[in-house]
Design a protein with these regions (language model features):
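Compact, charge-rich alpha-helical regulatory domains located at protein termini
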Residues: 1-15
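Acidic, Ser/Thr-rich low-complexity intrinsically disordered segments
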Residues: 251-286
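A glycine-rich phosphate-binding loop feature that marks nucleotide/adenosyl-phosphate handling sites
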Residues: 121-122, 159-167, 234-246, 267-268
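Intrinsically disordered or highly flexible coil/loop and linker segments, enriched in small
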Residues: 23, 27, 77-81, 154-155, ...
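Mobile "lid/hinge" segments at catalytic clefts and subdomain interfaces of large enzymes
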Residues: 159, 164, 168, 173-233
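Small-residue-enriched alpha-helical segments and adjacent helix-cap loops
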Residues: 13-15, 24-28, 43, 47-187, ...
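Conserved C-terminal portion of the radical SAM core fold
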Residues: 110-111, 145, 185, 222-233, ...
Length: 299
């Protein structure tokens, strides 16, 4: 390092490698994170923040929608429906973040981690519950995957999709991990992208049950966590190591089980809501503006 405190490139990378390798021993260093991760919200061009609660598998309830509407009115936020099947509250002042988090927590909602290098969304279609073309319960599987993976830290953001049939309404074939349901089970693809680079997923495996789909997905995410360079999206990592190597590792049942076990050890530390942790004192004080100590001249 060229300075005593390191640099803004190295510190976030080293912080991630340490928390991924030794989750039970290493304490996350908040000062080694990007500003959005430190503040648990995305800073906008005008200095305000966006707040996005998690909606499991794209599902919500009337009570959650009422809470979101109340928060939008209370904090004068713009309301935007996102492509990830969530609702974004835009224009929230930094000093209001703990309060809006507390209000959303009171309605049972947690952080959507829209700012994180970790799991973002699991986009789903309606599946067999409502769609006449659905082959499996894609919504239910998406919710299970999101509840297993949420809170995890990864080298870069991770997005999932679960489509109930090959018509692919959830756009699973351009996600980091995409599951396409078919009559015989589940087709799992990886290393897709829909940003500046557009990539179709590559077929990882076909499985017959939900349990297998969840096992393979979590194992893939953990393998990515352990082997990818910081800030490499899954498609860039797979390009480097090769899909054949990924398949070879994950095809071993013992290795899949070990990867799942290590993932759960990490999740025992990080599967928690940062909004709840920072919505009350003394953490909430960190979001207050600097005091105005201007002194009036003496008479």
């Amino acid at each position: 390092w060229k300075t005593l405190n390191g640099c803004p490139t190295c510190r976030p990378a080293i912080n991630f490698y340490l928390l991924a390798e030794w989750p039970l021993d290493y304490q996350d260093d908040a000062q080694s994170r990007f500003v959005n991760e430190r503040n648990h919200a995305n800073i906008q061009k005008d200095g305000t923040y966006s707040v996005m609660p998690r909606m499991w598998g794209g599902m919500t309830t009337p009570d959650e929608l009422l809470a979101i509407a109340a928060a939008a009115k209370k904090y004068d936020a713009a309301v935007k429906v996102t492509g990830g099947q969530r609702i974004d509250l835009l224009g929230v002042k930094k000093e209001d973040l703990p309060a809006i988090w507390a209000d959303l927590n009171a309605a049972g909602m947690v952080s959507g981690h829209a700012y994180s290098k970790g799991l973002r969304t699991v986009k789903t279609c309606v599946g067999t519950d409502w769609c006449r073309f659905g082959t499996q319960d894609s919504t239910g599987l998406g919710i299970k995957l999101e509840k297993k993976l949420w809170g995890s830290w990864t080298p870069h953001k991770v997005k999932l999709g679960v489509s109930g049939c090959p018509r692919n309404c959830a756009e699973a074939t351009c996600k980091d991990v995409g599951v396409v349901c078919v009559d015989s089970g589940y087709q799992i693809g990886v290393a897709g992208a829909a940003g500046m680079d557009v990539r179709e997923t590559q077929r990882l495996v076909d499985v017959a049950s939900e349990e297998e789909a969840i096992e393979w997905t979590a194992a893939f995410v953990q393998l990515y966590r352990e082997h990818a360079k910081y800030l490499d999206r899954p498609y860039k990592w797979v390009d480097k190591v090769g899909l054949d190597w990924v398949k070879e590792v994950l095809s071993d049942p013992a290795e899949r089980a070990a990867l799942n076990e290590r993932f759960e050890i990490s999740q025992s530390v990080y599967r928690k809501d940062p909004w709840a942790e920072h919505a009350s004192e003394p953490e909430a004080e960190k979001f207050q503006p600097l005091a105005d100590l201007t002194m009036e001249p003496a008479e």
